Amino acid sequence: MTEDTGIGWRGWLTRVLLLVLLASSIGAALLYTRYQRFLEQTISVSADGLLYEFRSGASLSGLARDLAERGVIDQPRMLGLLGRQMDLAHRLQAGEYRLRDDMTPADLLRLLADGDTEHYSMTVIEGQTFRELLNAVRASDVIEATLETEDAGEIMSVLGYPGEHPEGRFLPDTYHFPRGTTDVEFLQRAYAAMQQQLATAWEDRQEDLPLDSPYEALILASIVEKETGRADERPRIAGVFTQRLRKGMRLQTDPTVIYGMGESFDGNIRRRDLQTDTPYNTYTRDG
């Protein structure tokens, strides 16, 4: 090989390498620009958002492919790259999420990493019987049904409170929870909320009340509320009932008769109803 040939060959190689480097630089610049555009754009969902379930055991790459197939993002590989860059690849939590139209891909990943799932609500209604509450829980399409028995005593045992009567044990309130919450979890939460409120009220009670437990106080309060819908009348009625208890008298209050009649109550209380013994009838039972 002559000297001129060697110089020519090296010059040609240099030009090729420069072209390769230039192409690589341009490619890298284009990729960087696309990545920055991907980071800044919002995801494609409707104005109402999209309820999306990220299943247990799913991966970041699986999430990216699924979102791309749904048209939520257009660059699944870039979402995977972003997840690894943010160190969130193994921190995504299973659950149902609402993806909003103002979210960037980074917002979406943070939502799943934080476990900020969509929440639903159910209200335990004041005066609701345990059977009515149980039916409402079972009618929910977001609460998972696990209780297989209809027996109230068995249900209380499953909840962890064997031997306790279920009536009045669940605090009337609105509860928020994610999809997949079980019926047991929901009832345990409402039970715990009532226990906390009862404990607070019991601590603040008058010491001379003729009541032996927080549950007895709850029963009396429930009877008073059923006697009248007017808050200004309740102290007077509670005082009357308290005096009867101190004297060892029966309360003889109609709401306890109605409660004992259950679904057979047609809006009227007859003499035979007052005389029919039930666990709740204060015309036939003391205390």
Predicted regions and their residues:
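Alpha-helical interaction segments
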Residues: 22-25, 87, 270
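N-terminal type II signal-anchor transmembrane helix
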Residues: 2-47
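Bacterial extracytoplasmic/cell-wall-associated proteins, especially those involved in peptidoglycan
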Residues: 59, 135, 141-147, 156-287
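Signal peptide-directed extracytoplasmic domains
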Residues: 31-199
